[in-house]
Amino acid sequence: MATFTDAEIDELFETSGTVIDNIITAQGKPAETVGRSAIPQGKTKVLSAAWEKHGSIQPPASQDNPDRQDRSDKQPSTPEQTTPHDSPPATSADQPPTQATDEAVDTQLRTGASNSLLLMLDKLSNKSSNAKKGAHGRAPKRGITNVRLNSRGVNPVAETVRKDRRTKSRPPLETRAQT
């Protein structure tokens, strides 16, 4: 098994931290949606602001800067020490509205998604029940449903079939019982 010196281990941690940060902040192709958006109209500003705030918050990097570790041993931890250098220091007054906004956005997304899902399920069930009942709210008749009626209000095809059945000769009952 290979052994590493403390300097090599520190270098590996630093390199892996840099790689992880690059992966997290990498910009890929944005996801494309097909069909209607799940976000209700008028809510995009709130969601955009929440997303931008969420994207600007990064986890603390405790081993990036050795000076920072020395200071943390001497002084109690403050929000400024855990904040990355490239973003402005966060105050405790900024955090609760962000959390409340994030929770509100999550609730809106869940509620909106579940409401739209329920609405679509209702529409599908109504369509299927209407298809079963027929156009006039009653069960469909067996056979041809879209027929044209003649001037007497009778389906000419059905009338022809009835006439054929009446005029056809039937075999005797004994013969029918054998088949």
Swiss-Prot record:
Biased composition regions of type Basic and acidic residues, renumbered to the chain: 65-74
Record InterPro entries: Soyouz_module
Biased composition (Polar residues): 75-101, 108-117
Signal peptide positions on this chain: none
Region called Disordered, residue ranges: 45-179
Family of the protein in this entry: Belongs to the paramyxoviruses W protein family.
Entry protein name: Protein W
